């Protein structure tokens, strides 16, 4: 296993464990044995997905996770949950078809079932229409997993209708794994055909199209979130917007930007999981998840209100929390990678991301205003003094993690950077054989020529020290 797989296997297990701790699960689920068995199947599929570069195994592992998540979405057997599960299944089936067809086209072009083999085939000559069509279909399929616009239409209904534990697994663990798969495809298999989304020097490739997808996701997610009267649906559109932020970093096609995106997806998962836990607790007590249901939360349950403050301000990117560190790292890395040529680079996309982040403050603060400023109705003004341990863990651990990662981001950023360091190490070994670094790319035991940038000076210094 490479460092990236090891890190994200631990991340998926941690997020899955926190999802199990969500307080309402036992009340919503009549058959907990079957429910937690499906959760284990879903986690198994996600764990297998993080560590593979084999196209067929990747599809099988993703579908193992997806089929389990479809069932988990409707497990509470309410009308709303049934609708959520059906929509999730239908959209998921279409996305799986796109993904499988795309993988088959890529295999037909490269005659290899591994991403390393795909990269070798692409480096041998110009990409064929088969490879281009295959990559487009793969991005569409993974866009569904990440809830990127316009492939996000399943998300609001699933977030609102599914049991809280299921939603947490979809929102946190599944999104993290989807990003890992996308990073592997773009940074290993299709790195040599990235093109450029720079404003002053746009080149054909996947980067400009990913930049457009990022812009659409950010605008759709943030604008539609403004009109929501359900906090769960608000978090669903927030997920769409945050997928856009992640794609801003990937559009730069740099190791440091990809590392920042991987850091942020973990932070996003913790913040969203914690916000869902607080929302589920409020929904259990008040009967609905409207922003008005949060009125007076600071008086009813001060610790939940403070935790909600941490979660939503982290999602909004307010310092000194981990959400700010993640967004700053992504946007600054995207700017640094894309302006090396002397053009304005991704200034247009990063500027749009900053504007959309400012807009997101409105709907996050509207919920916090209810929790901290508004008075609760007398019928709801009951102190929460008997919270179970699982409730404390589901809300408290993510809140503490966001504060710690905000103050000490190197705890997670440094291990993630080892993925980039390993890539640079491979290039360095090939340079020792007399092959120019800017014309080489190595993955595992394979070496081939491609047009890639030389390792960053900081990475070269780390390699020299090692």
Regions inferred by a protein language model and the residue ranges of each:
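Alpha-helical transmembrane segments of multi-pass membrane proteins predominantly involved
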Residues: 1-416, 432
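A short helix/loop element that forms part of the nucleotide-sugar donor recognition site in Leloir-type
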Residues: 453-465
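Active-site-proximal region of nucleotide-activated glycan assembly enzymes
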Residues: 2, 413-442, 446-453
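Small/polar loops that bind or transfer phosphate-bearing groups
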Residues: 59, 171, 421-422, 466
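Conserved donor-binding/catalytic core segment of Leloir-type glycosyltransferases
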Residues: 135, 465-466
